């Protein structure tokens, strides 16, 4: 399984695209989140949106879903098909009603299922997306009153959505679930009201830090190189075997 971060930036980053990830397994391409910058990020990597086999949404903030309108329109009007959209069942209605309907509603496009081949995912299920690729939702805390879901990929890789610090969850995943790699969002400075701070992650045991890769960072990331303990930054555009 290969990981390519088409973007590694937080919602306000300008040097980096939105934190969205391309997972490829045996030719199957899964995009985790499709933020505002995703269409341009894919273009600059030479990847057409029509090459994606599915998009999976973790939560409904713009840096994670803001590119879905263009994706849906491109696929409908240029390629004549509804693309596969995977998302937690609790997000199906809010994604359309609160985010996409204003820009996408027109004759023949009156609900999410008109634009996308919607595949609702349930918490607790391990969903096989393709041969040798499965995903499990993990509810995690981000914004009060807004649901957000991190992911377990192929049973042993934890991919964090935007989330506050949950050390007990991370410990349980590693100790009891056999997680061998953690791809974790990070807020480099300030208090972690809705994100996990670097200082919080540095409080983890070094053994756990050594399996963590950092993403969703700010434009001043270069100032923190060498200051992340045993953790390393994921770099935008590079392909990592995971």
From Swiss-Prot:
**Protein keywords:** Hydrolase, Metal-binding, Zinc
Q: Which Gene3D superfamilies match?
A: Ribonuclease Z/Hydroxyacylglutathione hydrolase-like
Cross-referenced SMART domains:
Lactamase_B
> Any idea which positions bind Zn(2+) 1?
63-64, 162, 216
Q: Which Pfam families match?
A: Anti-Pycsar_Apyc1
This protein's cofactor list reads: Zn(2+)
Q: Detail which positions bind Zn(2+) 2.
A: 59, 61, 142
- What highest taxon heads this organism's lineage? Bacteria
The GO terms this record gives for MF are:
hydrolase activity; metal ion binding
Q: Does the keyword Repeat apply?
A: no
UniProt lists the family membership as follows: Belongs to the anti-Pycsar protein Apyc1 family.
Functional note = Counteracts the endogenous Pycsar antiviral defense system. Phosphodiesterase that enables metal-dependent hydrolysis of host cyclic nucleotide Pycsar defense signals such as cCMP and cUMP.
Q: How does it assemble?
A: Homodimer.
Put simply, this protein is called Anti-Pycsar protein Apyc1
The scientific name of the source species is Saccharibacillus brassicae
């Amino acid at each position: 399984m290969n990981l390519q971060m088409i973007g590694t930036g937080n919602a306000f980053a300008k040097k980096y695209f939105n934190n969205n990830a391309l997972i490829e397994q045996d030719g199957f391409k899964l995009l985790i989140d499709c933020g505002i910058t995703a269409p341009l990020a894919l273009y600059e990597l030479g990847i057409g949106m029509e090459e994606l086999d599915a998009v999976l949404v973790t939560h409904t903030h713009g840096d994670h879903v803001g590119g879905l309108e263009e994706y849906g329109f491109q696929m409908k009007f240029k390629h004549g098909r509804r693309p596969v959209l995977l998302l937690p069942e609790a997000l199906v209605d809010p994604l359309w009603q609160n985010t996409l309907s204003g820009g996408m509603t027109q004759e023949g496009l009156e609900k999410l299922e008109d634009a996308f081949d919607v595949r609702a995912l349930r918490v607790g299920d391990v969903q096989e997306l393709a041969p040798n690729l499965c995903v499990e939702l993990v509810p995690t805390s981000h914004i009060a009153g807004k649901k957000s879901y991190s992911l377990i990929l192929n049973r042993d890789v934890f991919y964090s959505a935007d989330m506050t610090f949950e050390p007990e969850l991370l410990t349980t995943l590693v100790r009891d679930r056999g997680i061998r790699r953690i791809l974790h969002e990070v807020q480099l400075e300030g208090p972690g009201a809705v994100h996990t701070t670097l200082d919080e992650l540095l409080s983890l045991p070094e053994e756990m830090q050594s399996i963590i890769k950092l993403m969703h960072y700010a434009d001043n990331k270069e100032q923190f190189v060498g200051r992340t303990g045993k953790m390393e930054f994921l770099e935008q555009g590079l392909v990592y075997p995971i």
